[in-house]
Design a protein with these regions (language model features):
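Feature captures the catalytic ectodomains and active-site-proximal regions of enzymes
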Residues: 2-405
């Protein structure tokens, strides 16, 4: 049987253009402007990236600009490169909420119809009674608070009594702070695992261990924070990739966010630069599959603390490292840069903000300069990944693969 010459050429080109490896880099909280429903979340006027740039009277991000970030609708204060090396767009969050899990799960193809619950007035009595019974410990706090402020407020009493500090925020989190000399780190993690089981029926997004050190008046949180997340409520593209034998490497808090599901390797990090280092190491070790990295410092160290200057410096640091990642790419690689929500350090709020997120896509053999527009869901990333690795169509999202091949 003869095959049409045109079809042969098409099949040959498809094989030549095949993508074998994807680096998905999440700049945690780098939002680019309020979503249409931001008012419902009290986030009117938020624009994390543009406001940070304005707050420091301009910012030089040449490598992100070269990929096209300045061309994205809603981004102000960055150069609009006429011929960018990448393609660009922005994404709207279809899920309800603005949590870390919500954003990451949606990237992986899972849309939440109901937001994860929050507790602005503290956790209900039945949760805290179970906490006391199951851990054998009384507690301090049980209110919404800034992590650094509640340690200042209750740290000394915690040292005197040995009671862990329980608090929450505007996000779906059950946070437990303890001095490392009072409650050793492994014991704190054990307490968090117990709390995770207690709050599972309530679908609280994360239990977070928040260890700190130092003396009263100079307490300092350590890098040994650990997240214990609710498992995704349905199948994600990570699950599908793993089941098909593809390497799925989670770097940073990705393993925690996905309840340690759908990953073939988990690599924890100390900070943004360590996250970039670990991403580079993973690129050197494997030539296929997904490398999924979260750089959390933007959110944890600067967004939540309303530190616009620190946020700007962190953006510059990551921008300087992008060439180190790109120079390791071969012709079958794709680079996706995005975010999971906003956390505008220039607004009175210290919490996440409901914002669009950037979408930058680059590859040696991919089209450049394509305006991918406003995507209706973060799940477009998951659908694109599913199409690339031929793991079946996801229930949510629209692939942008045909636009850039």
């Amino acid at each position: 049987m003869l095959i049409d010459a045109g079809k042969l050429e098409f099949l040959f080109r498809m094989e030549q253009d095949k993508i074998n490896r994807i680096v998905l880099l999440v700049l945690d909280s780098v939002g680019i402007g309020e979503l249409p429903d931001a008012r419902d979340y009290h986030d009117e006027g938020s624009n994390t990236l543009s406001h940070v740039i304005k707050a420091v009277s301009g910012l030089d991000l040449p490598n992100l600009e070269a990929l096209g970030i300045g061309l994205i609708e809603g981004v102000e204060g960055l150069k609009k490169i006429r011929r960018p090396k990448g393609s660009f767009g922005r994404m709207l969050e279809a899920s309800k909420g603005k949590d870390t899990e919500t954003g990451h799960w949606e990237m992986a193809g899972l849309i939440l119809e109901k937001p994860l619950p929050t507790y602005p007035h503290g956790f209900p009595k039945e949760i805290m009674e179970s906490f006391k019974k199951e851990t054998g410990l009384d507690y301090l706090g049980n209110k919404a608070a800034s992590g650094t402020e509640i340690i200042k407020e209750l740290g000394e009493e915690h040292i005197k009594t040995g009671k862990p500090i329980v608090y929450t925020s505007a996000d779906s989190v059950f946070q437990i702070a303890a001095h490392e000399e009072i409650i050793p780190i492994e014991r704190l993690y054990e307490i968090c695992r117990i709390a995770r089981k207690i709050v599972d029926p309530y679908h609280i997004g994360r239990v977070i261990a928040r260890p700190f050190i130092g003396a009263s008046g100079s307490f300092k949180r350590t890098e040994r924070r650990k997240d214990f997340s609710l498992s995704p409520t349905d199948e994600t593209v990570l699950d599908r990739l793993k089941s098909k034998g593809q390497p799925v490497v989670g770097i940073g808090k990705i393993g925690d966010i996905f309840g340690h599901r759908g990953l073939t390797e988990e690599i924890h990090t100390k900070d943004n630069m360590d996250g970039v280092d670990k991403t580079i190491d993973a690129l050197k070790r494997s030539e296929q599959g997904l490398i999924f990295t979260n750089l959390v410092d933007f959110d944890m160290l600067y967004g939540h603390r309303n530190d616009a200057r620190g946020y700007a410096e962190a953006l510059s640091e990551v921008d300087r490292r992008i060439p180190e990642i790109v120079e390791l790419f071969n012709d079958s690689d794709m680079f996706i840069i995005t975010a999971d929500h906003g956390c505008d350090p220039t607004t009175p709020s210290t919490d996440h903000s409901r914002e669009y997120v950037p979408l930058l896509v680059y590859g040696n053999k991919l089209k450049s300069g394509i305006d991918l527009g406003t995507r209706k869901s973060f799940a477009d990333i998951g659908q694109t990944i599913a199409e690339i690795f031929n793991v079946g169509k996801m229930p949510n999202g629209k692939s942008f693969l045909n636009s850039i091949l």
